[in-house]
Amino acid sequence: MTISSLPSAGRVPTGAQAPLGAAGGWPPPSTSAASRFGTEIVRLHTRMTFRGLPDMIEGEPIVRIVGLGDGLTTIAVRESQLPSRYLRGVMGFRLAQFLHIGWMDPDIAYRRGLYHEPLTSAAGPQTIHTLTLTAEGRIAGYVALVGSPDTAGKALDAPDRGLFPAERAHRVELLSAFSAPGRTTHNVYEIKRFVRDRFMERGPVSERVPWHLMLALGRTALALSDEIQVVCGDSRENGALRHLRLVGFEPLVIDDTRPSLPHDELMWPSYEQPQLAKPFAGVVPGDLAGYMDAIASGLELACAPGWQGAAVGRFLEVRASSADGPEAMAA
């Protein structure tokens, strides 16, 4: 199924599929109708292909990574660069992935007739979408950088600035420690929806997807260094936090929070998991380019044995060469 086959509105048909909870989702839906609906949403989006997407974006992508011998193509684009039908497809991928793992509420999706995450107009900076596509055009991985809700940038320690989603969920303030002259909330982005396709066959190619995403994130920060100075979010220790530390970030992490969202928000189940995410924020390190070169050098070995070890070896070299540790960009 191609992206042009995506429904234009309303609910997709339900069918006699395995219930959503059978795939390991949590919490199980409270009604069989919601279960069937959620299962069909997942089934619909696992058949979607986006083969033409790289050639359909408006203008040049912020980042394009291709030709590394693994058949993967990774692009980073601002939301306005995505044609509407592709944007809906990308948001549908997000919905399907997080319904499948139980981090979104299938009852809400069913009641609202959602086949993709709701589209919202950004009051501040546009969302930056990063996608890794297979040779067949399937989305293999995804991550978003979400900007501040402030229409105009405000100082990071301004008492009336808008909160980022992670701050709202954890009821913490993350940014005042990174306040600096000329740095505003429009220089901060939250990392969200970092995910590898849960249905992708595990193997040498799937192992490379998170590295593609991290390389694209880093190159995006380098390309937009005046704009992206601080990142924040929430993550489990073995998730985005681990990846960020590996590439030179020294994030401020707040432990022992009790995150939650109102039960009328689609993502509320994500904060009622056995292992909870921790909120974090950190300045983009000054030696980020070296770490990105290290990832690229590993990925350029294609799927040859030991490519990950080669990349990690380069990381250690970069770290050793930074006598004073990571320095902040645009400090």
How would you describe each model-predicted region?
Residues 1-66, 109-116:
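Acyl-donor-binding surface of acyltransferase catalytic domains
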Residues 20, 24-31, 59-116, 129-139, ...:
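Short amphipathic alpha-helix that is part of the acyltransferase structural core
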Residues 118-131, 151-154:
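A short helix-loop-beta-strand connector motif used in the catalytic cores of GNAT acetyltransferases and
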Residues 137-142, 189:
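Glycine-rich phosphate/pyrophosphate-binding loop shared by adenosine-nucleotide-utilizing enzymes
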Residues 144-151:
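Long, hydrophobic, well-ordered secondary-structure blocks that form the structural core
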Residues 154-273:
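Acyl-donor binding region in acyl/amide transferases
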Residues 238-316:
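Accessory, usually C-terminal, subdomains that scaffold auxiliary metal cofactors
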Residues 314-331:
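Charge-patterned, long linear interaction tracts outside catalytic cores
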